């Protein structure tokens, strides 16, 4: 499996919902109309990559890990399955309701098991966000002033690795 490394990445907005509306629509916030987290909803008139792929015969599924991307905000357009059920994997003490990376990966693997090729599976991880609370094995492996943040990154990286290992060999990532 091959990947791509980006040495610079800019976001369309400094908050989650408008940034992800841009990722899925290819439009900047002034065009798609989602300008902040909370009450904004992506208009059904905006076409998403999931809608285009679904129309082209792809099976589509999404697994998201934060309440700010709940289906009520319209990002579910074009997805046959949109798993925004944070369920038992919700991180205690977090400022935002979020599903931790391990639970997100487990949900993504369940979605993947029910998909037929060709498929588009979009998996959203909310780690790392404050409060930084990585599992102790990741926090203990890091050091320095950014130990908890680095532990969150290592934890998420481990879970993405678990997901990638389960993908069929010819999968384009």
Mark where each language-model region is.
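Catalytic domains that recognize anionic headgroups
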Residues: 1-173
């Amino acid at each position: 499996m091959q990947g791509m490394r980006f040495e610079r990445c800019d976001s369309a907005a400094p908050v989650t919902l408008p940034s992800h509306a841009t990722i899925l629509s290819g439009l900047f916030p002034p065009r798609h109309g989602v300008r902040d987290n909370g009450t904004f909803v992506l208009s059904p008139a905006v076409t998403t990559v999931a809608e285009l792929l679904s129309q082209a015969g792809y099976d589509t599924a999404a697994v998201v890990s934060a309440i700010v991307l709940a289906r009520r905000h319209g990002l579910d357009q074009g997805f046959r399955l949109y798993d925004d059920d944070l369920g038992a994997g919700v991180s205690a003490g977090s400022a935002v309701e979020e599903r931790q990376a391990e639970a997100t990966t487990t949900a993504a693997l369940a979605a993947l098991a029910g998909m037929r090729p060709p498929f588009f599976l979009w998996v959203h991880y909310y780690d790392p966000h404050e409060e930084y609370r990585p599992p102790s094995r990741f926090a203990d492996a890091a050091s320095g002033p950014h130990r908890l943040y680095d532990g969150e990154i290592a934890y998420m990286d481990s879970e993405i690795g678990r997901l990638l290992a389960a993908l069929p060999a010819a999968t384009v990532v």
